[in-house]
Structures are given as structure tokens and as C-alpha cells.
Amino acid sequence: MIARCKGCSDLLPEDMLRFRYIESIFHDSCITWGYEEVRTPMLEYLSLFTSSGTLTPQMLKRVYSFLDWDGWSGERVVLRPDGTIPAARLYIDSLQEMDVARLCYTSNIFRFDETGKKSRENWQLGAELIGVTSPEANAELITLALETLARLGFEDVELRLSHAQLIKAVLAQLEPNADEQHKIFDQLLDGDIALMSRLETEKPELFRTLKLLMENKGTSASFLKNVMAMAGTAGGELEEPLNDFIAGVDVLDKLGVSYQIDLASGKGFEYYTGVIFHLFVNGEHVGGGGRYDKLIPLLGGPDKPAAGFALYLNRLIPMIDAEDMYDMVEEKILIKYQGDNLKTAYEIANLIRECGISAELFYPGVDTAAYGWAVTVKAEDCYEVTDLIEDKTLELKEQSEVIYLLNGEEDA
């Protein structure tokens, strides 16, 4: 027996039903907010992720790369390890004439995991807002993400906020090298005692500020204002990112959005430049995003600010209850026929499909529990329509009567 690749998953019919359900809710939400759908290729040049320094060396170690042979001059390509960077490249290639671009997409990303315990292929639903730099733009993306999750039936979504520039401003006072800053931040998150002791001795005011940010979880702009007041002389470099952070949470306060300020949630801040947000449902990390104002110019494009987010389909799929998809099951129609009525069965099935309803021919072994209705063609003028959910049956003479009934019309 041939096994699937380690770290990869098959999506079975029930998984795909949930996949499409989540995707449709996300897509519908995006369209109503003015976002337009795009799709980027699975393969991108490795240079897209290396030349601009958009991904850390640690992340680049996890990409799948290989030579795209063209004689001996082939370039190295990768299976995309990220959704935002290709979307930014797409904007530079094809959409620069748009001053403001709202883009959304579904994409799979690939990241190597040596253990094989984590998934190496993950599906994401992404949205990017390009050309606007304001707290209101950040709030729009956060609200869109929360709205999508609410429509999926998740009531208690935890929103955690951090700020990339604030993290960088703190770390810059400890280590000027950007790559080393990522390591130090990981050490801080892991509670490295030696590092904390060194910091307390060498930079006591910065230590107090950092300790306050790392150990406390604020829920309002006043928390950040208190941090600024307590930072003292160490707060000079922190003032600008703190003010930007305060402006962002002020907008969320006005909109009545609940959140938690958690600097530690900013892990993985590679190309972010401002507010970073993460979304949790029952403790499960289901999405996140932030502001990346320098990414597009880093890739050779215009000086355009941007922000975006992704929802993690692989994590959402097992969290969707079948009852949440009741309407999708209810709309599936099973078509049966007796005797020599195959052609009539095809006719009624096509009429049902023209109404935008799924109609499938019955074969032995089909599980009727997956369908809302069954239509049995007994003759050209005799149709038995069964509500499989309510277990009620009605006999009709005309195809039009069947269509009226399945469409919820009272004329039948």
C-alpha cells in the first residue's frame, strides 16, 4: 500500500463540504466589503522571498525549493511558503494603477517540518487592503475577519493585539542586528533568565517597560498610555510605535470591539511594520494578520502601505458542526425513477439544477441521510416528492409543481 507524504492530509468529501462552506462564507463577506478575488501561482521564484529580506533565515530553512530547469540556466523556485508576499507581487505586476486595492484569495502554502507531525501543506483564506495607512484600515480588516468567524457560528472569538514596530524598538536597544532580534524575542518569550538578568542590570528602565508589556494583558488604550508614562527615558524610541498602537486600539474601542493587548502574540513579525493581530477560538489559533507598509516597496513596487490577514482553513474545518451546514444538506435533491423513466428523471433533474439546487441520480448504496429531498419519477405525469428531513411525502402530476415545491413556493 502506498502511503501519502508525511505531513500531508487528504480532504475527504465531508472535509471538502466544510472547506467550501467556510470558503463561501469568507468570500461572501469579502464581496460585501468590496474585496475582489485573485489567485497567485503555487510556484514563485525563491528570490521573491530572499532578495528583500521579507522572510527570516529560520523561515527560509523551511521552504520547499528546487531548480526550474531550462538547460543549465534554470532559476530556483519554491512552493509558496506565504500568501501575502505573492499577493503583493501580484499587485506590483498587474494592479499598480489601483490607488486602493482590496484583494481576497484562497491559497495553499507549504512549509517543511522535520518531524512530520505538523502539516506541511496548509490552506488559508486571505484578504489584503493595499494603498491605505490608517487605524481605520486596520479596524476594517479586523472587523472583516471577526464578521466571517461570527457568520461561521463562532461566538467567543479572542482577539490579541501586538505591534511589530514596538517590538523592534525594544529589541533594537538590545541588539542592532535584525536577524538576532528574532532570536532574542524568542528567548524573551521562553523566559530566558540569563537574558532578563542582563537586561535588568544594563537597562533597568527598558527592563521595567518590557516586563510590563510582557507580563500584563491590557484591554484598552489607557493600558498603553500607562506604559508610555512608565517608560521614562527608555521610552524615547518607543513613543512613535506606542502612539500608533494607541491610535489603532482607540478605533477598536469606538467600534466596541473587544481585544487583549499581548506583546508576546507578535511572534513571527518578519515583514510587519505596525499592528499585528491574532484570532483564537477556544484556545485554537485560527487566524491573524497585520500591517506591512514596507513590503511592496521592498519587492520593487511603489511606496504603497498595506495590511492583511489570513484565516487558517485546516484548523477551522474540524471546528465546523454539521448542523451549521444544515441549509447545504437541505438543498441536495436525490432523483429516483421507476421503470423506463430515465429520460424524465434527467429532465426534472436539469430543471432543478437550473434553479441553483443540487440534484443527483440515485444509485444503490447512496446514503439518503445526506439529502434534504427525494423525487421519484413514477411516470411522466406522476412525481413522488419526499421531504427526507421531515419524513413527509407528496404526490404531484406536473414538473412545474415539483419545482414550485422545492423552491419553497406555496403554489404547489
UniProtKB/Swiss-Prot annotation:
Subcellular location field: Cytoplasm
Pathway: Amino-acid biosynthesis; L-histidine biosynthesis; L-histidine from 5-phospho-alpha-D-ribose 1-diphosphate: step 1/9
GO biological process: histidyl-tRNA aminoacylation; L-histidine biosynthetic process
One function term, GO molecular function aspect: histidine-tRNA ligase activity
Highest taxon in the source lineage: Bacteria
HAMAP family: HisZ (MF_00125)
The name this protein goes by in its record: ATP phosphoribosyltransferase regulatory subunit
Species of provenance: Dehalococcoides mccartyi (strain ATCC BAA-2100 / JCM 16839 / KCTC 5957 / BAV1)
Lineage of source species: Bacteria, Bacillati, Chloroflexota, Dehalococcoidia, Dehalococcoidales
